[in-house]
């Protein structure tokens, strides 16, 4: 049984029930009071605050075209301040930041003949569209784009100045997947497209290629399971020699993916996250590995989870954080999940490119066919020059001017040994974040300078159910600051891009723009400091939380300790309304306590001598006895500042005093409401009885003329005599079945606290925040 009264709104009201005794006995009561914690320390993987869609909607800007879906391909052009969006059968161009203006649009539809061929191949109608998969900047005047084109991939170019149509169409096989469900990756380097996808209709031939000129002239991976074994590609990134601080090197392209391991460690197919690297100057071999990569090397990515590394089975996404020029090498942030059913684990790990390079320069692995494990190759078995290396100036001095001049023994070795023996460990040796209750799918990151000048990495994590988690990296840990609901309907985040202070999120139904520097939502100094946002600082001059932009005068901020007590002036305390909870039966009462921050540490204060208490995450469970009557208060502390969040007075029903007039008014209103319901019920009952009597007269008349009384009369529906099965509402509220037929609609009369015949948690009338747990009665 559930009955709920609304929480009284702030405003003029009678003086609340005093929670504490007169001052003369206050000290004695405080000494006698006990303190019970609400729950243990909440890990920083739990978002500190959560904004539902009703509150978050004011911080978001949305774009969606009528009858257009799958906004999954996003490309930001910082030079023109433009966001290009690839959707189903359409490509859009929006000016950033967008604010509702009409975008430019190109419709790239599939001809009906192609759609018919698609359906003849056994594909569904909804699959036979052109899903845009690749958007890349080809040069200053043109974009390169590729789409699935009803399971016949096509590529073309777009003149960005006119933005009218896709021109110079050509086959996209080997560049673009055949369907959107196939994971792929693509990146432009030096005006050249590097892709990782599948080449055939069945999706059984994976390929990593440099797609230049005719398809037969491409440089691509060998068709061997030792090179690629059922991969799911995630991302592709380019690092230049300048970013390494190595002027003698070559551009290196990194591909991140998950593939099935060929090592038989168990009877199950083991998925392994990996990184592969090729060199931009690779021309393939002269005889061996013709038109094939001679620099293709790959290594395992290790992101160990709580269950012996099982959290690292599947790589969901990878992003790069590029610092300012000359400020160091980039950093890779990846999202990992478990491949095992029932293990809902997500982990975030950071990887350094120099660690990847060190592994690629380490020992090779060889899979022995007479055993089920790979073994390292001995150093004396590795030919010279070292297989898989980019062509450097030092190699050119040794008469190896390009990969075409490499000896066959080197090419044969790299063909048979593409996998390295050692894994790549995360930058800090362990994950930055591990959670078991959130499925992360996408990640982007940028580096923010705090008020003190120290830099912090801020990550934005998109979830499977359409939420956005904002996290800041403090040392070797990620702290999730905020959970933001993005969409009115639950749907996964499909893509994300950053543009200055704006985050752009693509999903099935829309593109959502999020302001990442919206500090104005933090209304007080304590809220601003506790938010631990490197962008935001409290301005004493403006008496507001603002984006500091490097300004220091009259501002405070504390990212790592959030010490409110030393930075903010003492704010006037708000005394919560004391809710009187009348009880007249033995049972369990749950007194809720909901602090604004999940990281707050809360304790309960209750009368002395009360021992039958059970702290819960949502409040305090009290066994109702005469000795449990008295005052209860939930006090929460964070950042050195404490305040009472909730206060209750537990009394026997007969002890209600005149101070509870507000509840009396609410109760009178509820009584009037239920009396109205009773009157309506009596009216319906009288009408039903009249119809029943009319039905009986009809049956008697039919009986006289020999009619079959078992057959229903014309215009009626036959009902079985079996008892009605419980409805979904009955299953959710088991008391509805047990109490059917008593009171109004099967529920007891209001304000009655009779014992419950079946286990349930019920709301106590007259106590809008309290629940009664009758499981032990």
Curated annotation (Swiss-Prot):
<dbReference type="GO" id="GO:0005783">
    <property type="term" value="C:endoplasmic reticulum"/>
</dbReference>
<keyword id="KW-0770">Synapse</keyword>
<feature type="domain" description="Sema">
    <location>
        <begin position="48"/>
        <end position="516"/>
    </location>
</feature>
<feature type="disulfide bond">
    <location>
        <begin position="279"/>
        <end position="390"/>
    </location>
</feature>
<keyword id="KW-0732">Signal</keyword>
<feature type="modified residue" description="Phosphoserine">
    <location>
        <position position="725"/>
    </location>
</feature>
<dbReference type="Pfam" id="PF01403">
    <property type="entry name" value="Sema"/>
</dbReference>
<dbReference type="GO" id="GO:0030215">
    <property type="term" value="F:semaphorin receptor binding"/>
</dbReference>
<comment type="function">
    <text>Probable cell surface receptor that regulates oligodendroglial precursor cell migration. Might also regulate differentiation of oligodendroglial precursor cells. Has growth cone collapse activity against retinal ganglion-cell axons.</text>
</comment>
<keyword id="KW-0393">Immunoglobulin domain</keyword>
<dbReference type="GO" id="GO:0030517">
    <property type="term" value="P:negative regulation of axon extension"/>
</dbReference>
<comment type="subunit">
    <text>Interacts (via PDZ-binding motif) with DLG4/SAP90 (via PDZ domain 2); this interaction may promote translocation of DLG4/SAP90 to the membrane.</text>
</comment>
<keyword id="KW-0524">Neurogenesis</keyword>
<keyword id="KW-0597">Phosphoprotein</keyword>
<feature type="transmembrane region" description="Helical">
    <location>
        <begin position="668"/>
        <end position="688"/>
    </location>
</feature>
<keyword id="KW-0221">Differentiation</keyword>
<dbReference type="InterPro" id="IPR002165">
    <property type="entry name" value="Plexin_repeat"/>
</dbReference>
<feature type="domain" description="Ig-like C2-type">
    <location>
        <begin position="586"/>
        <end position="641"/>
    </location>
</feature>
<dbReference type="GO" id="GO:0043204">
    <property type="term" value="C:perikaryon"/>
</dbReference>
<feature type="glycosylation site" description="N-linked (GlcNAc...) asparagine">
    <location>
        <position position="515"/>
    </location>
</feature>
<protein>
    <recommendedName>
        <fullName>Semaphorin-4F</fullName>
    </recommendedName>
</protein>
<feature type="topological domain" description="Cytoplasmic">
    <location>
        <begin position="689"/>
        <end position="777"/>
    </location>
</feature>
<dbReference type="Pfam" id="PF01437">
    <property type="entry name" value="PSI"/>
</dbReference>
<dbReference type="GO" id="GO:0045211">
    <property type="term" value="C:postsynaptic membrane"/>
</dbReference>
<dbReference type="GO" id="GO:0016020">
    <property type="term" value="C:membrane"/>
</dbReference>
<keyword id="KW-0966">Cell projection</keyword>
<dbReference type="InterPro" id="IPR016201">
    <property type="entry name" value="PSI"/>
</dbReference>
<feature type="domain" description="PSI">
    <location>
        <begin position="518"/>
        <end position="569"/>
    </location>
</feature>
<feature type="modified residue" description="Phosphoserine">
    <location>
        <position position="727"/>
    </location>
</feature>
<dbReference type="GO" id="GO:0030425">
    <property type="term" value="C:dendrite"/>
</dbReference>
<feature type="disulfide bond">
    <location>
        <begin position="146"/>
        <end position="155"/>
    </location>
</feature>
<dbReference type="GO" id="GO:0048675">
    <property type="term" value="P:axon extension"/>
</dbReference>
<dbReference type="InterPro" id="IPR045791">
    <property type="entry name" value="Sema4F_C"/>
</dbReference>
<dbReference type="InterPro" id="IPR027231">
    <property type="entry name" value="Semaphorin"/>
</dbReference>
<dbReference type="GO" id="GO:0045202">
    <property type="term" value="C:synapse"/>
</dbReference>
<dbReference type="InterPro" id="IPR047085">
    <property type="entry name" value="Sem4F_Sema_dom"/>
</dbReference>
<feature type="glycosylation site" description="N-linked (GlcNAc...) asparagine">
    <location>
        <position position="70"/>
    </location>
</feature>
<keyword id="KW-1003">Cell membrane</keyword>
<keyword id="KW-0217">Developmental protein</keyword>
<dbReference type="InterPro" id="IPR015943">
    <property type="entry name" value="WD40/YVTN_repeat-like_dom_sf"/>
</dbReference>
<keyword id="KW-1133">Transmembrane helix</keyword>
<dbReference type="InterPro" id="IPR036352">
    <property type="entry name" value="Semap_dom_sf"/>
</dbReference>
